[in-house]
């Protein structure tokens, strides 16, 4: 499996970039920012040059990471494959936990999902290996919990 960094140091570096971007945006807009503004505009690719006209501008964003889950991740990965890129450009992980249906008990439900969704899991596992994504197998508990263990960002 590809190692995807998810550490406090990594988060701290991302927060520095986000604060720098927001300082530029605040200077340009001269208005208070909403939480949505902070999340989106903090991820601008080039905040100095980005057109910022509400309802009109298309934003060029640079996400910190991409997280796919097994249900919608299939179409997302197929779209990525159409780009003809050899590897993902940002840390990307695929989490196979949404196709497991609660019917009887954990072990039986996991076995049923492994059988019913084998083709999906095999495709996502193969695509993750080919394109440099992290892959969380079905049954890896609440595989997305790690996202919230990082020090929270405080946008002033």
Predicted features by range, described:
Residues 2-7, 22:
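Short, contiguous pre-domain boundary segments
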Residues 11-13, 18, 22-156:
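Long, structured ligand/cofactor-binding scaffold of large enzymes
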């Amino acid at each position: 499996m590809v190692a995807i960094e998810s550490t406090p140091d990594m988060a701290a570096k991302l927060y520095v970039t986000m604060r720098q971007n927001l300082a530029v945006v605040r200077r340009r807009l001269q208005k208070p920012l909403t939480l949505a503004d902070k999340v989106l505009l903090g991820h601008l690719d080039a905040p100095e040059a980005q057109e910022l006209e509400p309802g009109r501008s298309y934003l060029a964003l640079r996400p910190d990471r991409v997280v796919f889950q097994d249900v919608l991740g299939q179409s997302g990965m197929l779209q990525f494959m159409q780009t003809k890129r050899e590897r993902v450009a940002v840390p990307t992980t695929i989490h196979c936990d949404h196709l497991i249906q609660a019917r009887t008990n954990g072990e039986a439900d996991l076995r049923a999902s492994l059988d019913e969704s084998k083709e999906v899991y095999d495709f996502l596992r193969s695509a993750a290996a080919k394109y440099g994504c992290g892959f969380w197998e079905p049954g890896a508990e609440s595989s997305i919990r790690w996202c919230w263990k990082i020090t929270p960002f405080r946008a002033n």
